Design a protein with these regions (language model features):
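Conserved donor-binding/catalytic core segment of Leloir-type glycosyltransferases
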Residues: 23-40, 46-50
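Short hydrophobic beta-strand element within catalytic cores of glycosyltransferases
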Residues: 119-122
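Short acidic/histidine- and often glycine-rich active-site loop of Leloir-type glycosyltransferases
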Residues: 69, 125-139
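Aromatic "clamp/platform" in nucleotide-sugar-dependent glycosyltransferases that forms part
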Residues: 102
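Short alpha-helical donor nucleotide-sugar binding micro-motif in glycosyltransferases
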Residues: 89-94
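Conserved acidic donor-binding segment of nucleotide-sugar-dependent glycosyltransferases
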Residues: 80, 134, 138-145, 154-160
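Nucleotide-activated donor-binding/catalytic signature segment of Leloir-type glycosyltransferases, i.e.
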Residues: 62-85
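A short, well-ordered alpha-helix in the C-terminal region of glycosyltransferases
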Residues: 161-174
Length: 194
């Protein structure tokens, strides 16, 4: 899979996005789904919220009105971003992108986060681990919510900036949509020539 690496790029100024959602200087643990469910990790984020320090906040994008009513106050719930740039700003502002999915094939959100210079922390499940290397994030065992948070804290301790260049370089080498389209065309040509 490929993504638009011009749209999903490192945004260096996170002041506006932090002000918009009243995030202050907190470490942002970002989660994103088109529809949140148990399988996408909604319950895992709620559990994680009970373990947060004062300087940490969870930001979840894609939350329904009904889910917003039930989330604890240390989870900032966003229905939808206004545009792709705002999404790239959120990815870039985050200390880590956490994808606690219980089943997924090859989540595009992981690619988008890495392209924006943000390391990914995910469960060892399906294709969610395929874009995560030791330079682009952490993989923890499925259901280990404490392990997810510990990985985020390791990123924060080391300094997210230490991951940014490696994440972006990995995205440029592996996620360019034009390159992936060319790969698909070659594959189709090879199949049809036989």
């Amino acid at each position: 899979n490929g993504i638009d690496l011009e749209a999903f790029d490192v945004q260096h100024d996170d002041k506006a996005i932090r002000e918009k959602y009243n995030l202050g200087n907190k470490k942002i643990i970002l989660g994103l789904a088109s529809i949140w469910s148990k399988e996408k990790g909604l319950d895992d984020f709620v559990e994680m919220s009970t373990m947060l320090n004062e300087d940490e906040v969870i930001v979840m994008v894609g939350v329904s009105e009904e889910q917003m009513k039930r989330l604890p106050p240390n989870i900032v719930a966003i229905r939808r971003t206004e545009n792709v740039r705002q999404l790239a700003e959120l990815y870039s502002a985050a200390t880590a992108f956490v994808n606690p999915t219980w089943q997924d094939n090859y989540p595009t959100v992981n690619l988008e986060a890495i392209a924006c210079g943000t390391p990914v922390v995910t469960y060892r499940t399906g294709g969610s681990i395929e874009a995560v290397t030791d330079k682009t994030g952490f993989v923890v065992e499925q259901g280990d919510v404490k392990g997810l948070l510990e990985a985020v804290r390791r990123i924060a301790e080391r300094g997210k900036v230490k991951y940014t260049a490696d994440c972006r370089a990995y995205a440029l080498a592996n996620f360019r949509k034009e390159d992936r389209y060319a790969d698909y065309l070659k594959l189709y040509e090879n199949i049809t020539v036989r």
